[in-house]
């Protein structure tokens, strides 16, 4: 069953992308590029965005099949809820930017409130309706200790889901970067879930891996399509949720290390400029800094993937120790 669902996830995405690209072009759903960004990016203007729809559709269809045919599908129901919720926020944001020609998209407040709502509903579904049995404390690796939070854990869920959904969104600025890092991350969590005996979560990770593998060939440099906020916000929300459901929250700091580094680079840049009027990096997020240093896009992506693989293995080691 696992192999069949993996193949279905791969094929749905791989078939949908070539169908969607001309449709997006015809509807002029193209990406706008920041003028102050690297000049090499200007050629990307008009590249179809919202491509994340393809792998989200694949994930939804394949997950529904899994829910129908496997036992103990409650974790998949929860993960599917988060996928659809964060994906919908991203879709609305993309729609406003691309169709309504409003580069701001949803306001930060609107996004934050929507993300809070999803996090709270996730907590209620998991704890009140007992759809899964993860603890409401933060697990500390190696010392077999947990910081109990009880009902306050919902605050952590909000912070974790919102933080990582936006972290993946910030990272999705180079062809194939966020897609490749996400594949690496879900491989690590699939293995971790296997060691924990969390078969449903492991199956969902495998579905994610193969759905993204179907998208990757079209997203590599030169990208024929971008995932947009539709894809990136969903991926970040899923990563946070899986780490929570496996009670391995802190492992995500390593498995998602590049996402964290990209986010910190933006925070450091903004803080430094406000306090001193000086910038630490040539440009943020971090991948743009390396481009302006002289690295070509493919080199940046390859190096970041390599870093993601190394830190991902460290995160896996932490998660299974």
Swiss-Prot record:
Q: Which PROSITE patterns does the record cross-reference, listed alphabetically?
A: MRAY_1, MRAY_2
The UniProt entry's GO CC annotations, sorted and at most eight, read:
plasma membrane
Q: Per the record's keyword annotation, is Membrane included, yes or no?
A: yes
Q: CDD domains per the record?
A: GT_MraY
Q: Looking at the keywords, is tRNA processing present?
A: no
Provide the alphabetized UniProt keywords: Cell cycle, Cell division, Cell membrane, Cell shape, Cell wall biogenesis/degradation, Magnesium, Membrane, Metal-binding, Peptidoglycan synthesis, Transferase, Transmembrane, Transmembrane helix
The coenzyme or cofactor needed here is: Mg(2+)
In the bilayer, the protein is annotated as:
Multi-pass membrane protein
Q: Name one GO molecular function term.
A: metal ion binding
Signal peptide limits: none
Q: Which EC number(s) does the record attach to this protein?
A: 2.7.8.13
Q: In which pathway does it act?
A: Cell wall biogenesis; peptidoglycan biosynthesis
Location relative to the cell: Cell membrane
Q: Which reaction does it catalyse?
A: UDP-N-acetyl-alpha-D-muramoyl-L-alanyl-gamma-D-glutamyl-L-lysyl-D-alanyl-D-alanine + di-trans,octa-cis-undecaprenyl phosphate = Mur2Ac(oyl-L-Ala-gamma-D-Glu-L-Lys-D-Ala-D-Ala)-di-trans,octa-cis-undecaprenyl diphosphate + UMP
Q: GO annotations under biological process?
A: cell division; cell wall organization; peptidoglycan biosynthetic process; regulation of cell shape
Which parts pass through the membrane? 1-21, 50-70, 76-96, 112-132, 140-160, 173-193, 198-218, 225-245, 250-270, 300-320
Q: List the disulfide bonds.
A: none
UniProt lists the family membership as follows: Belongs to the glycosyltransferase 4 family. MraY subfamily.
Which PANTHER family did the record assign?
PHOSPHO-N-ACETYLMURAMOYL-PENTAPEPTIDE-TRANSFERASE, PHOSPHO-N-ACETYLMURAMOYL-PENTAPEPTIDE-TRANSFERASE HOMOLOG
Query: What biological function has been recorded for the protein in this entry?
Result: Catalyzes the initial step of the lipid cycle reactions in the biosynthesis of the cell wall peptidoglycan: transfers peptidoglycan precursor phospho-MurNAc-pentapeptide from UDP-MurNAc-pentapeptide onto the lipid carrier undecaprenyl phosphate, yielding undecaprenyl-pyrophosphoryl-MurNAc-pentapeptide, known as lipid I.
Instruction: Indicate what this protein is called per its UniProt record.
Output: Phospho-N-acetylmuramoyl-pentapeptide-transferase
Q: Which organism is it from?
A: Staphylococcus saprophyticus subsp. saprophyticus (strain ATCC 15305 / DSM 20229 / NCIMB 8711 / NCTC 7292 / S-41)
């Amino acid at each position: 069953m696992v192999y069949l669902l993996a193949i279905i996830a791969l094929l749905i995405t791989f078939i949908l992308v070539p169908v969607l690209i001309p449709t997006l072009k015809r509807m002029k759903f193209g990406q706008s590029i920041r003028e102050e960004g690297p000049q090499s990016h200007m050629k990307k203007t008009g590249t179809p965005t919202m491509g994340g729809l393809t792998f989200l559709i694949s994930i939804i269809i394949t997950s529904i099949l899994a829910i129908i045919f496997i036992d103990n599908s409650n974790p998949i129901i929860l993960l599917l809820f988060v996928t659809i919720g964060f994906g919908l926020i991203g879709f609305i944001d993309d729609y406003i930017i691309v169709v309504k020609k409003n580069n701001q998209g949803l306001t930060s407040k609107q996004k934050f409130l929507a993300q809070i709502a999803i996090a709270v509903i996730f907590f209620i579904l998991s704890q009140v309706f007992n759809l899964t049995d993860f603890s409401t404390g933060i697990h500390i690796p190696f010392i077999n200790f947990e910081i109990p939070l009880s009902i306050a854990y919902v605050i952590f869920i909000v912070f974790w889901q919102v933080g990582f959904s936006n972290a993946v969104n910030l990272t999705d600025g180079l062809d194939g970067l966020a897609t490749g890092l996400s594949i690496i991350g879900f491989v690590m969590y699939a293995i971790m879930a296997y060691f924990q005996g969390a078969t449903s979560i492991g199956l969902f990770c495998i579905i994610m891996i193969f759905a993204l593998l179907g998208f990757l060939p079209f997203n590599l440099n030169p990208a024929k399509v971008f995932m947009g906020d539709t894809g990136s916000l969903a991926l970040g929300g899923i990563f946070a949720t899986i780490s929570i459901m496996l009670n391995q929250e802190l492992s995500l700091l390593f498995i998602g290390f590049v996402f964290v580094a990209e986010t910190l680079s933006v925070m450091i840049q903004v803080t430094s400029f406000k306090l001193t009027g000086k910038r630490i990096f040539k440009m943020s997020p971090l991948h743009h800094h390396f481009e302006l240093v002289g690295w070509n896009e493919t080199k940046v992506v390859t190096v970041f993937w390599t870093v993601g693989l190394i830190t991902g293995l460290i995160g896996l080691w932490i998660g299974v120790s």
